[in-house]
Amino acid sequence: MTQYTPMIQQYLKVKADYQDAFLFFRLGDFYEMFFEDAVKAAHELEITLTSRDGGSSERIPMCGVPHHAAKNYIEQLVEKGYKVAVCEQVEDPKTAKGVVRREVVQLITPGTMMEGRTIDEKENNFLAALTHFEDGSYALACNDLTTGQNTVTLLTGSVEDILLEVYATGSKEIVVDSTFSKDELNKLTETLKMTISYEDTTTIPEGLEHLVKSVSQAKLIKAIGRLFNYVIRTQKRSLDHLQPVEIYYTNQFMKIDVHSKRNLELTETLRTKEKTGSLLWLLDKTKTAMGGRMLKQWMERPLIQKEKVEERLEMVETFVNDYFLREDLKEKLKEVYDLERLAGKVAFGNVNARDLLQLRRSLLQVPAILEAISLLDNAYAARLIQGADPCESLTELLGRSIQENPPLSIKDGDIIKDGYNDKLDQYRYVSKNGKTWIAELEKRERDITGVKSLKIGYNRIFGYYIEVTKANLGALPEGRYERKQTLANAERFITDELKEKETLILEAEEKIVQLEYDLFTALREEVKVFIPKLQHLAKVISELDVLQSFATVSEEEQFVKPVLTNKREIFIKDGRHPVVEKVLNGKLYVPNDCIMPEKMDVFLITGPNMSGKSTYMRQLALVTVMSQIGCFVPATEAVLPVFDQIFTRIGAADDLISGQSTFMVEMLEAKNAIANASERSLILFDEIGRGTSTYDGMALAQAIIEHIHDQIGAKTLFSTHYHELTVLEESLDQLKNVHVSAIEENGKVVFLHKIQDGAADKSYGIHVAQLAELPESLIARAKEVLAQLEGQEEIVIPKRVEVKVPEVAPEPVVVKEEPAEIQETKVETEEESQLSFFGGEQSSKKQDKSVLDAKETAVLAQIKKIDLLDMTPLEAMNELYRLQKKLKKG
């Protein structure tokens, strides 16, 4: 290292402490990067890679960005998941002896970004910290540095379950200890695209103990300690805005796993991963950024306490019924800026004058908001605004201190109002009058010399000067001016009087800028005192904003207030899928009832593809979520229980973590529901069993239905293409067949999208294929095959027709007609086994008893004794398999 220059040695010493980050090393007006950082940054930022002499035999790779544009480049790197360590000059180069002292003043990471393109105003930017304990449990702590919010919870389950919970927080960065499993870290980085950071210290940092007063569990404190120590180590500044830690337990809220949230498209769509088209998109009529964030948090955690849900519903009803109150509140909320993040910027020391002006404008709305809510005859409203301080003294302070149109920078002056500080007023008087004197001097000198083009100007290098063109130099009185600068076409002069005024004016202007900066930083410290009150106000206003949002969308979309019941019954009259209805944009939407009495647990849904089975299932889930976050629901009448969990298996399986097959993911999701559901849960299973053979799929589907019906008792919607399962209605007294109806008109299918009692009589799959515009020849052949199948007593494989195939294709398998006797059957492949479910051609022919041997006659006798009406389909299939095996033994 001694081979390098002192400056490069300094760089390498700092870089050694930040190996996992880009080091932005301040050199004058630039941030420079060297060595590998330079090569990688030049590629990522698309900037020029150059080199410089660093004292060694080889030149050092180097790239840099201007300090005034660094924010944009830092955002680009952090957006890609990188970390950036900002190293500043911490002493004046003019007075430095040797190399200027430099220190890292902040480590900017995906989880600690305070502002920029990556920060959505209606999204939290959580940093997560995960701590693993020997008993298999985990503590998960989260912090949003932009708002100061802190949460912690205790989790149990498999590592993959825990990682999915972390993923559900939306965190872009997770802090773990250095012993955390490398395999699990790979899943976080490669699959979930999270940035990994390390922190081994778990004690609560000094000065932050007051934030964990409500936390007594040692496990939770360790997770919070890890989180806080990482934040302090990386940010290196005041964290006065950090809020007391909120403990939450997953059993206090409706549990909806990550897969179910995605399937239901609660906050983003499955296809585009965007908000537009999700339930959040529909319900978000909030007027403030903080209200938008609270709405999303409510949707992530629906309530399970009936009384709390009813309180919200009553408040929403109040807003629905009082149009003028609601509209007045909305108008005031429009003028409220993001109090939470403004408080964070105050604490962080990066608030500017415009931010404080936004704070004042927001506070001006608060008294009227609180007064309007206080007049409501509502206990929930009274409790909500209790202790809310409108901070009128802060409003007054900001009103008399900050200019109405201040500049963005706090170092350019013109921030503080006249009358706020006497000394500042004096400097401004000198500066203003001095400039007036300059203008008067210019006029006087023109009159004395007779040179009308004479002017007095200023630049930063030469100060004030009198400028006369060379053509007019002869008109100047001898000895009146002292020459200062010669130009190509003019001369510049100075006088003793002008020098004196210049000193006064420049000193005043310099002192004005410095004094304004000092006054602003002092003002910022005064505002810090109000941070807890501002954060409390933010919570109150956020909640009011969400409630008015529910009221607004409920009135616009004609939602109805649900009635919550302690009974296990569902009564939804004319229910609608709220998002589908909105997207149809005025087109006729077909509503559907969902009526499940206390003794009715399972709806077995059959019907055509594309008929609306999945929409109907999602519709019920969304209605329950909307109800339990306190919103009205899309129906003409709704009576609902309070569900503790929702489990779904709808649509294409989307495995976030393990890389399992689609069928395995389907089975794991089914297992999750079966293992964790209670009689207070809602289960939605769509086409379980499709990913395996027909026998296996049908057997699994029936076994799952029976288990839910007999052992769990959860309200369940189970859609299937296995029409054979509809006979379960005869043996399972709490199961009911329903179907989505369709009719045929002029050879075409018309989907009615209406749920009706009973099983569907046909699938209309060929009609769906026509809608997909499959080749007409293929459709014609499918219809021919279908006609042959439907014309037989049993399902059989129809005769093949000769089809021309490419020469490279294998020869077609031809079904050979055998004599009308039971043939010896070889062990079948999986494909053959699936085909054999439909039977061979010989199965449709009557057997000639004369050719049966004794064993076959005995089997026939056993078949005659079987009481099919007393067997489930699964038992029947097992019996058939046993008899077939007996025949094969020969």
UniProtKB/Swiss-Prot annotation:
Q: What species is this protein from?
A: Bacillus mycoides (strain KBAB4) (Bacillus weihenstephanensis)
Function of the molecule: This protein is involved in the repair of mismatches in DNA. It is possible that it carries out the mismatch recognition step. This protein has a weak ATPase activity.
Q: Which gene produces this protein?
A: mutS
- List the CDD domains hit by this protein, alphabetically: ABC_MutS1
Instruction: Give the NCBIfam families listed for this entry.
Output: mutS1 (TIGR01070), PRK05399.1 (NF003810)
Determine the domain of life of the protein's source: Bacteria
In the record, biological process GO terms are: mismatch repair
An example molecular function term from Gene Ontology annotations: ATP-dependent DNA damage sensor activity
Gene Ontology terms: cellular component? cytosol
Provide the protein name: DNA mismatch repair protein MutS
User: Which family is this protein grouped under?
Assistant: Belongs to the DNA mismatch repair MutS family.
Which keywords has UniProt assigned to this entry? ATP-binding, DNA damage, DNA repair, DNA-binding, Nucleotide-binding
**Xref: SUPFAM superfamilies:** DNA repair protein MutS, domain I, DNA repair protein MutS, domain II, DNA repair protein MutS, domain III, P-loop containing nucleoside triphosphate hydrolases
Q: What is the lineage of its organism?
A: Bacteria, Bacillati, Bacillota, Bacilli, Bacillales
Residue numbers binding ATP = 607-614
Record has Nucleotide-binding as a keyword? yes
Q: Which InterPro entries does the record associate with it? A: DNA_mismatch_repair_MutS (IPR005748), DNA_mismatch_repair_MutS-lik_N (IPR007695), DNA_mismatch_repair_MutS/MSH (IPR017261), DNA_mismatch_repair_MutS_C (IPR000432), DNA_mismatch_repair_MutS_clamp (IPR007861), DNA_mismatch_repair_MutS_core (IPR007696), DNA_mismatch_repair_MutS_N (IPR016151), DNA_mismatch_repair_MutS_sf (IPR036187)
